[in-house]
């Protein structure tokens, strides 16, 4: 179910585009350039997608699904260490210019709240209560929609009430590939994440990997480099994204991609149940626009201001266009009936995190906990210069690119979460220690 952000601006004159922006640089992950402000907010679709999934596959009434979130916000929730780590870089430049946003994160003296301190957003509790009582439609055509649209129009935003009212999630046929005795399904175009993940999985199978020695780590880096090169050269500015993604996968399946190889505000939840249903959900607000429309308590996304996903330029998409995405929620089914759900936040580290966890678990036989907690690497692109960022514990002696070492597990490398139901009915779950994830096994 594709519930990703759309380009807004339906019915607006051309002169309304291009404004509402603040260009900032934050120190997160070694330095990130991004754009925030009302003009960076795309049409959010996550709530509509969750509603559709609940209608098709859920057992509980919608109000009961929303109730735990409502109670957490109503009673106040603790600021997590992972959130605080990001906010140390972003609280002023991203969230500090908008008064409701700043007030939610800082005390009366202007101090950023510390990990474990309680966050109170009373207006968000009221919004969740309306959504629980009246359905997801409240966000798109009700009072919440009117509050959001009004704030956008008053502050150079291009998100309109028509954009919200028109938004519909799309059910797409997933990309499916075989890994060992597993069939792995992930999200298809126009998202980039699922296709690049699938290409990496296919390429990793072209060379024997029975451990993470220096040769295998070097091959992993070359696979990431090759897919990154293909993306930069063919996908980010593509006029026919689906055709170019099809070519990527075709060449990866045939091994032809070797010619390419040789040369924080995202969350994920994975769940499986006793009936063998697996659910993988990734939602993103980008880095955050800093915007909290008065009366809503809702932080809005900055998906139009994520530079790596908008290489065509600011506001270059046509209204109604579904934006590209790095997200890759994934499910897999073994021939013995076991099911696995997996995904990760982490911007362009999403796919590289997932592929390494899948290789660790499906191919190398690690437990889910071992697979998620194993050191990772990620090939970065800095203005055309590639660098391999890696966590200590991986032998990088044979890697041909410059390297950037992290001395321990770091939230920069994503926050994978996985849940598995084995054929015998037992459950296995794992949450990434890099981002303070949590797990639970329960039932009704």
Identify the residue ranges that each predicted region occupies:
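Internal maturation/activation junctions in enzymes
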Residues: 206-284, 296
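Active-site rim segments in enzyme catalytic domains, especially the processed small/beta chain
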Residues: 1-2, 7-8, 16-18, 158-160, ...
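Short, small/polar residue-rich loop motifs at catalytic or cofactor-binding pockets
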Residues: 171, 263-266, 325-327
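Catalytic phosphate/nucleotide-handling subdomain of diverse soluble enzymes
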Residues: 136-222, 227, 292, 299, ...
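Noncatalytic scaffold domains of N-terminal-nucleophile
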Residues: 1-135, 139-141, 145-184, 188, ...
């Amino acid at each position: 179910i594709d519930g990703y952000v759309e380009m807004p601006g339906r019915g607006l004159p051309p002169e309304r585009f291009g404004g509402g922006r603040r260009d900032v640089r934050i120190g997160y992950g070694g330095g990130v350039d991004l754009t925030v402000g009302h003009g960076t907010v795309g049409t959010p679709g996550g709530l509509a997608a969750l509603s559709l999934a609940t209608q098709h596959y859920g057992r509980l009434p919608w109000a009961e699904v929303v109730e735990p979130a409502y109670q957490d916000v109503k009673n106040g929730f603790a600021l997590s260490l992972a959130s605080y780590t990001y906010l140390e870089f972003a609280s002023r430049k991203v969230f500090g210019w908008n008064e409701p946003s700043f007030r939610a994160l800082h005390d009366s003296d202007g101090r950023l709240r510390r990990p474990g301190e309680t966050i109170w957003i009373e207006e968000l509790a009221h919004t969740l209560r309306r959504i629980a009582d009246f359905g997801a439609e409240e966000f798109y055509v009700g009072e919440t929609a009117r509050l959001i649209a009004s704030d956008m129009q008053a502050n150079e935003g291009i998100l309109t009430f028509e954009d919200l009212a028109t938004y519909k999630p799309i059910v797409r046929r997933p990309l499916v590939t075989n890994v060992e005795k597993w069939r792995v399904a992930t999200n298809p175009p126009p998202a980039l994440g699922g296709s690049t993940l699938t290409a990496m999985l296919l390429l990793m199978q072209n060379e024997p990997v029975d451990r993470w020695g220096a040769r295998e780590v070097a091959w992993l880096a070359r696979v990431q480099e090759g897919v990154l090169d293909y993306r930069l050269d063919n996908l980010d500015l593509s006029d026919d994204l689906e055709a170019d993604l099809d070519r990527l996968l075709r060449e990866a399946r045939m091994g032809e991609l070797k010619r390419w190889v040789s040369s924080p505000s995202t969350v994920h939840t994975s769940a499986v149940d006793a009936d063998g249903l697996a659910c993988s959900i990734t939602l993103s607000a980008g880095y955050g626009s800093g915007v909290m429309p008065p009366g809503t308590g809702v932080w809005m996304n900055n998906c139009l201001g994520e530079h790596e996903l908008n290489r065509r330029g600011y506001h270059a998409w046509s209204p109604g266009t579904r934006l590209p995405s790095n997200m890759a929620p994934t499910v897999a089914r073994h021939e013995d009936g076991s099911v696995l759900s997996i995904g990760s936040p982490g911007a362009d580290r999403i796919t590289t995190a997932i592929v390494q966890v899948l290789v660790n678990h499906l191919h190398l036989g690690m437990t889910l906990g071992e697979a998620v907690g194993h050191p990772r690497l990620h090939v970065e692109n800095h203005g055309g210069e590639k660098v391999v960022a890696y966590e200590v514990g991986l032998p990088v002696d044979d890697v041909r690119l410059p390297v950037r070492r992290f001395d321990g597990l770091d939230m920069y490398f994503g926050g994978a979460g996985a849940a598995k139901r084995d054929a015998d009915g037992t459950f296995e779950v794992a949450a990434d220690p890099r981002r303070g994830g949590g797990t639970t096994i329960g039932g009704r």
